[in-house]
Amino acid sequence: MSNPTSTPRADGFRMPAEWEPHEQTWMVWPERPDNWRNGGKPAQAAFAAVAKAIARFEPVTVCASAGQYENARARLDDGNIRVVEISSDDAWVRDTGPTFVIDDKGDVRGVDWGFNAWGGFEGGLYFPWQRDDQVARKILEIERRARYRTDDFVLEGGSIHVDGEGTLITTEECLLNHNRNPHLSQAEIERTLRDYLAVESIIWLPNGLYNDETDGHVDNFCCYARPGEVLLAWTDDQDDPNYLRCQAALRVLEESRDAKGRKLVVHKMPIPGPLYATQEECDGVDIVEGSQPRDPSIRLAGSYVNFLIVNGGIIAPSFDDPKDAEARAILQRVFPEHEVVMVPGREILLGGGNIHCITQQQPAPRKA
């Protein structure tokens, strides 16, 4: 497997949109007891449900530790799900796995961003994180795909969305946070994104969702549905701390033009809840120095925008919330050619994310 010293853009590669054909989806099996309650068993059931939902549409590969391999293999009893042994620190493969890039000659490669657990020693969620920083490399080794490594640039896959036609959406709250790349200016960060993802236009939303532990990942707040159309988490409640965030994002989106010069169509997606963990749920998480404490008074950053587009399907979270039905209807309207599958997302949310955060699509090779 080669490790090019050039950049994807220089080699003719680009990050494809999520709706472009997939070869498979990657996941990592949860077990960390200081993040997942009750030894991770409820989360494992939730991850298994997500994996099986995706497997209806495309192959799934789940990475499990040596200690959990047999358990994961038994619970993922589906012929379209492969389980491989990979050690990791936690289960957020959107952020620790590779960002795959493709060219028009049938090749697929991967970008291995630096990872510091969403902030390193200035707000990061756990330490150590070196096994998570190795996940992308291990996946690319398994797939025998060339790897572009950015040793001096930290980025999580959940902090970006692309339309496949030259436009990227992100948030200032995350990418400009001093705990990611304090040595780089905004212009230098943009240059890196252009070099490694082959985008032309970058739309900067001010913030992500309120109380998002990742410092406002865009994949929990706003995502592309197709070129020129986005879904935006939304509330009309002026007392909701998300209200001003939604308004500010909408202003930016309405004033922006994408790389093709198009104005954006914005589909508003209701925010569930407000949702909170129960005391019992918090008590089920181990207390370990250096990890994120759980508090039932802190609002959870629940979002229906945190879904995954797969081959012919939309895998989206439900929360046993009155807005679940409305979210499903919006997704079905926005994606009329896809089957919308809602999977319970509360257990994943309790750990700090949702379906998009725990998945990473690998695009299928394609030739022009």
Curated annotation (Swiss-Prot):
Assigned EC number: 3.5.3.12
Domain of life: Bacteria
Catalytic activity reported: agmatine + H2O = N-carbamoylputrescine + NH4(+)
EC class of the enzyme, as a word: hydrolase
Pfam families in UniProt: PAD_porph
Pathway(s) where this gene product acts: Amine and polyamine biosynthesis; putrescine biosynthesis via agmatine pathway; N-carbamoylputrescine from agmatine: step 1/1
Key words, A-Z: Hydrolase, Polyamine biosynthesis
InterPro entries for the chain: Agmatine_deiminase, Peptidyl-Arg-deiminase_porph
A Gene Ontology biological process term: putrescine biosynthetic process from arginine
Molecular function GO labels: agmatine deiminase activity; protein-arginine deiminase activity
SUPFAM superfamilies for this protein: Pentein
Triggers of expression: By agmatine and N-carbamoylputrescine.
Enzyme active site: C357 (amidino-cysteine intermediate)
Family the entry assigns: Belongs to the agmatine deiminase family.
Biological role: Mediates the hydrolysis of agmatine into N-carbamoylputrescine in the arginine decarboxylase (ADC) pathway of putrescine biosynthesis, a basic polyamine.
Subunit structure: Homodimer.
Name of the protein in question: Agmatine deiminase
Lineage: Bacteria, Pseudomonadati, Pseudomonadota, Gammaproteobacteria, Pseudomonadales
Gene that encodes the chain: aguA
